[in-house]
UniProtKB/Swiss-Prot annotation:
Belongs to the TUB family. Ubiquitous. Residues 40-49 have a biased composition (Acidic residues). Gene3D superfamilies: 1.20.1280.50, Tubby Protein, Chain A. It comes from the Eukaryota. Residues 7-18 have a biased composition (Low complexity). PANTHER family: TUBBY-LIKE F-BOX PROTEIN 7 (PTHR16517:SF50), TUBBY-RELATED (PTHR16517). Residues 50-105 form the F-box domain. Residues 1-51 are annotated as: Disordered. InterPro entries: F-box-like_dom_sf (IPR036047), Tubby-like_C (IPR025659), Tubby_C (IPR000007), Tubby_C_CS (IPR018066). This is Tubby-like F-box protein 9.
Length: 372
């Protein structure tokens, strides 16, 4: 199914031979009649799939359990994705065995990027920025280091659309244009860069209505899952407070994010859509003034190393932790900070998903005329 397609960004394809039949420009090779993809080829593929699907359900489940247990981290975890791509029965077995990030703290399938993050500890990620072409790349950290090779998760590219700025978010780092088949969602800002709206390409819960505005039409015509209607669904808003007096100080931001309530434990969030959604209010944690350093400070627990106006931590105000089980108003739901010129850490936890956290962090880039 399309939801489990393996692009170059998620599962490395098998290397192909680069040598031609002739072996050189001066050699003449015989013509080879093209192989027609007739009924025989289709029957052969169906027979191959049927052979794999004949395994006993108990045996298939045990195979998936062992593969899942033996591949806790990427890149070995690509074996789990490969097994899910064999056929429908193998996919169903993978869905029944692989737990969502909320429970296992791991990202396995592309669908995991729109599921709530871990419950007990934050998911460590980092963002790399390319200023030349206005692109941003989200990676999953594979080690304790602040940056490493990482596992690619999402990419975004900034476009000017009249007086507005839009960030197109995609599963594919090489396909970041309007109309992309890998379109995940987008972020849209106002002229001043102080108010942002987050749009999801898929309905966040059952009965969600797509935006009707002309500017928020879905760019991609190809849906990730043909069983679910596609469109641009508003799932959050981020706003930065105006600084009329131009006083020096940290930015102040507020977020209202639509988070599903009663998330299904299935690895495929589109298999059973959530029937309800509730807005989660987040605000940035106020930093303290350090007299000796003469700067504003936050405790990032070693995950941020460079002072920047972009650095922030988001917490839930008192009384808004239910029904997501947030411990208290000191629990950091999302933190973002600079570690190099074009590298930033991004750590998130439930109820935010990787997609939502990435979109919120993207709002920190760019000039904010009324906030600086």
């Amino acid at each position: 199914m399309a939801l489990w397609r393996c692009s170059s960004s998620w599962l490395s394809s098998v290397s192909r031979s680069s040598g031609g039949v002739g072996g050189g420009e001066s050699k003449v090779s015989p013509e080879i009649a093209p192989v027609s993809g007739g009924e025989g080829e289709g029957e052969e593929e169906e027979g191959e799939e049927e052979r794999w699907s004949r395994l006993l359900p108990e045996l298939l489940t045990e195979i998936m359990r062992r593969v899942d247990a033996g591949a806790e981290r990427w890149p070995p975890r690509r074996d789990v994705v490969a097994c899910a791509c064999v056929c429908r029965r193998w996919r169903d077995a993978a869905v029944s065995v692989v737990r969502p990030p909320l429970e296992c703290g791991r990202i396995t399938f592309p669908s995991s990027l729109k599921q709530p993050g871990p419950r007990d500890a934050p998911m460590h990620c980092f963002i790399r920025r390319n200023k030349k072409n206005s692109t941003f790349y989200l990676y999953l950290s594979l080690t304790q280091a602040l940056t490493d090779k990482g596992k690619f998760l999402l990419a975004a590219r900034r476009f000017r659309n009249g007086a507005h700025t839009e960030y197109i978010i995609s599963y594919d780092c090489d396909d970041l244009f309007p109309g992309s088949n890998s379109y995940v969602g987008k972020l849209r800002s106002d002229f001043l860069g102080t108010k942002f709206i987050i749009y999801d390409s898929q309905p966040p819960y059952d009965g969600a209505k797509p935006s009707r505005s002309q500017s928020s039409r879905r760019f991609a015509s190809k849906q990730i899952n043909p069983n679910v209607s596609g469109g641009n669904y508003e799932v959050g808003q981020v706003s930065y407070k105006f600084n009329f007096l131009k006083s020096r100080g940290p930015r102040r931001m507020q977020c209202n994010i639509q988070c599903p309530v009663g998330q299904s434990t299935a690895s495929d969030p589109l298999k059973k859509l959530i029937s309800t959604s509730s807005p989660l209010a987040l605000r940035n944690k106020a930093p303290r003034w350090h007299e000796h350093l003469q700067c504003w400070c936050l405790n990032f627990h070693g995950r941020v190393t460079v002072a920047s106006v972009k650095n922030f931590q988001l917490v839930a105000p008192a009384g808004t932790s239910d029904p997501w089980g947030i411990a208290d108003e000191e629990t950091v739901i999302l933190q973002f900070g600079k570690i190099e010129d074009d590298a930033f850490t991004m750590d998130y936890r439930q109820p935010l998903s990787a997609f939502q956290a990435f979109a919120i962090c993207l709002t920190s880039f760019g000039t904010k005329l009324a906030c600086e």
